[in-house]
Curated annotation (Swiss-Prot):
Protein name per the record: Lon protease
Bias type Gly residues, positions: 826-836
Lon proteolytic domain segment(s): 640-821
Single GO cellular component term: cytoplasm
Biological source species: Desulfovibrio desulfuricans (strain ATCC 27774 / DSM 6949 / MB)
Induction of the gene: By heat shock.
Gene: lon
Length: 880
């Protein structure tokens, strides 16, 4: 709708004028009287004017405006043809046919450039302007159509026919349409803030559909083509429907516009208020004589900091560019704050600061030995790096990944490495990180943008070559925000990280001097490209002796001090410490052991606080009083195994375990039942073992008819604990043979290895942990695959002295070792070297001993004593 700027006038706001190009405008619409009033008073005059309209009229082309009946409008006439048309009209009845131009840019419109339907107007006033233009005031009289043009020069003239206005009968449908149009008009007026009682009275006072349509169309903002369509519609109801459609569209536009203006006004009001307050503050400072030169001081301070930073030339070029931008900004603008923060980051980064490496190899070894017990491989790798660094100062830093179970000291090892090298230490926890921007940073276009964690760590360290530990790298996630592991590819690539670009800085930063250390529990979850960039060093679990030594040197003194005690107040016997480790913790690391020692110290601290005098000596008997009943009970070592029983070895995240496998036979039809919550791989190992036995039944002393006459049941105790992996293959085979031929398996021997259908024994993992478990159980012999002899280097020599290791290629070599009464010589012990070369011949001899003169019937299930309840083992993955 048009704007109503006064309560007494209904105004038309149609924009530029009717005639020629620039400078041609409508007169101020305030000169136009209320159309409703004019129509009421001059209705008879207009009727007379309509009757006196001649058949031939001068034509006045107008731009960007359509005139409707009863509409009063001032026009400025500038084109010579138009001026002559007006003068001709004044000489003969003061009538003109006003037609809209099809194209506003047309300077000399001809008959084909104007619409054929226009409005006959009566010239009410004329005024000649000093610049040769003419101003006229016209009022619409009647619609008319051009029949034919009678002349083109010196102005357009045409024969016309007027279009009569029908008066429809006002019924319920017409009344509903009238109300709808009025309501839509009121909404538009209200949204534009122009509603007034007088204007609403004008709308309510017009009951004729055609006249109401013309009145509203004359005061509505719409395109010329839409207005022309309304003008050319002869039926009043159809015309009113078109107006109603335009009003609905205008309501939608006005609603959105009002919302936008409200939002903009609120923001403008706040900005004006802030500006006003700042100006007042400046005036107050000026009155106080406090000159505002803080901005210049800040720029000089930033420039000095950038000079001191020692950044590369290309980075300094970008910094100077941003500094010039900042100088041209208002100090309190939001953009200035962004640029200022960016320059602060550039100035505070260690572009040239390097920590001097401590290249004393002996001193570094001493520090590593003080902080960590064992971990010889990792210590050797760090010392190798120091040696290379000493010989070649320009060498790049290694990217190591420490992989192992929780609590074995992966993260603390990074701190020890930094201390040994004399470098600063930073740790980044990557567990649960899903956003790539955490690594690369956010772009400065975002509100609250910051650099990534890598750049932040370098700023905190203050040097360009710290030791940065990327903790829990295997627990990185990925979602719609990106993949942080992909962002780490550049960070951890020595060929690329010398030009690492953070999204926030948007300039290269050299990371090649940084020593990155990653930690992980499981390598399988690390993406292959990322794992390929790291040198993986596996940290095995601690042995009993290592745990006891660490507890004596580090954990116990630490907990005594934390709980307000002194070392002289607490004495923990070796046997008591071993009991705590064996019966209250079951882990590869030390966290639970640390908690149990802390619990002991707290209880002793309470005794001291209650007045009891120390020192307090903790013996084996005192452990249960302080910590309660043991949480883990070691399985009793069997003096004799019943037929069908064999001892295997399993690897768990908490270390190695001795696994008992039981097999029994019963009358049936050759079925095989497997229980003990076994995984698919372990079930397949049992099937392979059974197939191997069936293929060599007679050689193994087993009656071949067992396939059709007996059922076999294999069970692995601790049924609540899931078990899987291929390394129980030889154990399952041995238990099945024992159950089928009735021979007992030696109770002091355990075994591990994958079995094939040909009887070959394949290598498995976790050899160190498995041998440690066998030693802890007190077993004397262990059978391993021959290809695992290389892993014996990781087993402490003192442990190899307590158990004999028997490497085997084929299951035939295992037979003379496992059954009671057979020779157990030819193993590996001491330093872990292979036994005499006669191992194979002995195995062959043993094989002859095992083969019976005739195959034995499957042994009847033996009656055995009731075993003690076995504790559940942690999840055993026999394959490793």
């Amino acid at each position: 709708m048009a704007d109503y700027n006064d309560k007494n006038y209904l105004l038309h706001m149609s924009g530029p004028d009717s005639d020629t190009g620039p400078g041609i405008e409508n007169e101020d619409p305030r000169a136009v009287e209320n159309p409703g009033h004019d129509l009421a008073e001059s209705e008879g005059g207009l009727a007379a004017a309509m009757q006196s309209i001649p058949d031939t009229l001068p034509i006045l082309p107008v731009r960007d405006v359509v005139i409707f009946n009863y509409m009063i409008l001032p026009l400025f006439i500038g084109r010579e043809k138009s001026v002559q048309a007006v003068e001709a009209a004044l000489k003969s009845g003061r009538h003109l046919l006003v037609c809209a131009q099809k194209e506003e840019a047309t300077e000399d419109p001809g008959p084909e450039d104007i619409y054929q339907v226009g409005t006959v107007v009566q010239v009410m006033r004329m005024l000649k302007m000093p610049d040769s233009r003419v101003k006229i005031l016209v009022q619409g009289v009647s619609r008319a159509r051009v029949r034919e043009f009678s002349q083109v020069e010196p102005f357009l003239e045409a024969h016309i026919e007027t279009l009569p206005e029908a008066t429809p009968k006002v019924d319920a449908t017409v009344e509903a349409l009238l109300r709808s149009v009025r309501e839509q008009s009121e909404k538009v007026l209200s949204l534009r803030g122009l509603s007034s009682p007088d204007v609403l009275a004008v709308l309510q006072g017009v009951d004729d559909p055609g006249r109401l349509a013309d009145l509203i169309a004359a005061n509505m903002r719409m395109k010329t083509a839409d207005a022309q369509q309304i003008l050319e519609t002869e039926d009043p109801l159809d015309r009113l429907m078109l107006v109603n459609t335009q009003l609905q569209r205008e309501v939608e536009v006005a609603t959105v516009q009002a919302r936008i203006q409200s939002s903009a006004r609120e923001g403008m009001d706040k900005a004006q208020k802030d500006y006003f307050l700042r100006e007042q503050l400046k005036a107050i400072r000026s009155e106080l004589g406090d000159k505002d030169d803080e901005g210049e001081e800040e720029l000089e301070s930033l420039r000095a900091a950038l000079d001191k930073a020692g950044m590369p030339k290309d980075v300094r070029k970008e910094a100077d560019k941003q500094l010039r931008r900042l100088a041209g900004m208002h100090a309190d603008s939001s953009e200035a704050n962004v640029v200022r923060t960016y320059l602060d980051w550039l100035a505070e980064l260690p572009w040239k600061k390097l920590s001097r490496d401590r290249l004393d190899i002996a001193h570094a070894k001493q520090i590593l030995d003080e902080d960590h017990c064992g971990l010889e491989k990792i210590k050797d790798r760090i010392l190798e790096f120091l040696s290379v660094r000493k010989l070649n100062p320009q060498s790049k830093g290694p990217i190591l990944c420490f992989a192992g179970p929780p609590g074995v000291g992966k993260t603390s090892l990074g701190r020890s490495v930094a201390r040994a090298l004399g470098r600063k230490f930073q740790r980044l926890s990557l567990g649960g990180m899903h956003d790539e921007a955490e690594i690369r940073g956010h772009r400065r276009t975002y509100i609250g943008a910051m650099p990534g964690r890598i750049i932040q760590s370098l700023k905190q360290a203050g040097t360009r070559n710290p030791v940065i530990v990327l903790d829990e790298v295997d627990k990185l996630g990925a979602d719609f925000r990106g993949d942080p592991s992909s962002a780490l590819l550049e960070v951890l690539d020595p060929e690329q990280n010398h030009t690492f670009s953070d999204h926030y800085l948007n300039v290269p930063f050299d990371l090649s001097k940084v020593m990155f250390l990653c930690t992980a529990n499981h390598l399988e979850t690390i993406p292959a490209p990322l794992r390929d960039r790291m040198e993986v060093i596996t940290l095995p679990g601690y042995t009993m002796q290592e745990k006891a030594e660490i507890a004596r040197k580090h954990l116990l003194p630490k907990k005594i001090k934390e709980n307000g005690l002194q070392e002289k107040d607490v004495t923990l016997d070796d046997a008591a410490l071993e009991k705590v480790i064996r019966e209250y913790t079951r882990e590869a690391g030390l966290r639970n052991l640390e908690r149990e020692l802390s619990s002991i110290c707290r209880k002793l601290a309470r005794r001291k606080a209650e007045g009891k005098k120390g020192p307090f000596r903790v013996s084996t008997a005192d452990v249960e009083k302080l910590l309660g009943a043991p949480r883990f009970i070691e399985d009793e070592k069997e003096k004799k195994l019943m037929p069908g029983m064999a001892l295997g070895l399993a690897w768990t995240p908490a270390g190695g375990e001795v696994l008992t496998v039981e097999a029994t036979v019963m009358k049936g039809k050759g079925g095989l039942t497997l229980t003990g919550q076994l995984g698919d791989v372990m079930k397949e190992s049992a099937q392979a073992a059974l197939s191997y036995i069936r293929s060599r039944a007679e050689e193994l002393g087993v009656d071949p008819s067992f396939v059709s006459e007996y059922d076999i049941h294999v069970h692995v105790p601790a049924g609540a604990t899931p078990k899987d992996g291929p390394s129980a293959g030889v154990t399952l085979t041995t238990a099945l043979i024992s159950a089928l031929n009735g021979h007992r398996v030696r109770a002091d021997l355990c075994m591990t290895g994958e079995i094939t259908l040909q009887g070959r024994v394949l290598p498995v993992g976790g050899i160190k942990e498995k041998i440690l478990a066998g030693v802890a159980r007190g077993l004397k012999h262990v059978v391993i695959p021959w290809q695992n002899t290389k892993d014996l280097e990781d087993v402490p020599k003192e442990l190899l002295k307590r158990i004999t290791v028997h490497p085997v290629h084929h299951y035939d070599e295992l037979l003379p070792l496992v059954f009671e009464g057979k020779s157990g010589k030819g193993g590996v012990s001491g330093a872990g070297q292979a036994g005499d070369k006669g191992g194979k011949s002995k195995a062959a001899a043993g094989k002859k001993d095992v083969v019976a003169a005739r195959p034995a019937k499957p042994a009847a299930p033996a009656r055995r004593r009731k075993d003690k309840t076995e504790d559940e083992l942690p999840t055993a993955e026999a394959g490793a």
